[in-house]
């Protein structure tokens, strides 16, 4: 179990997976509805799927195919990429591809890499995620969660606005 930081509080996250890592389920809980997960849980009366992630063998090719079909990725803050560059010192080409595609990145101590691409929120809080793992990266990109959550909150309609 690990904590994910949201500007509205802490989200408790528990990951469950099969031995091969081909099926992974992450369950989130929050003590208040000020967090993105807490609001979603409250609005869905405690039981719903907030997002579905698909694995890709090449996240950049997946992004290109999605864009050709009208997809617009969740817009990640430029500050994220400044922090990313300082943390990992990526080569210019990789850095530019991540930033221009709004792709999140993580690397573990063994050199395993993790790439994440998100859709905007649809309807009442549902979104898609595309992930690519390279090497033996076994995590879920928890370091990226606050940036994803902030981007989702920025893109959400203001509180009090009609939903439809």
Each model region followed by its residue ranges:
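Glyoxalase I/VOC metalloenzyme domain signal
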Residues: 7-164
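Short, solvent-exposed loop/turn elements at beta->coil junctions and helix N-caps
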Residues: 2-5
């Amino acid at each position: 179990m690990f904590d994910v930081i949201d500007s509205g509080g802490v989200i408790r996250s528990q990951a469950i997976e099969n031995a091969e890592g081909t099926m992974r389920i992450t369950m989130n809980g929050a003590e208040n509805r000020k967090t993105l997960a807490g609001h979603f849980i409250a609005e869905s009366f405690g039981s719903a799927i907030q997002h579905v992630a698909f694995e890709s063998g090449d996240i950049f090719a997946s992004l290109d195919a999605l864009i050709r079909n009208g997809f617009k990725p969740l817009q990640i803050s430029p500050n994220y990429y400044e922090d990313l560059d300082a943390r990992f010192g990526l080569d210019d080409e990789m850095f530019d591809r991540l930033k221009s595609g709004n792709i999140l990145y993580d690397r573990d101590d063994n050199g395993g890499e993790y790439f994440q691409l998100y859709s905007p929120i649809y309807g009442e809080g549902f979104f898609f995620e595309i992930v690519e793992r390279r090497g033996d990266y076994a995590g879920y990109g928890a370091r990226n969660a606050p940036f994803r959550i902030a981007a989702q909150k920025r893109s959400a309609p203001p509180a009090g606005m009609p939903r439809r």
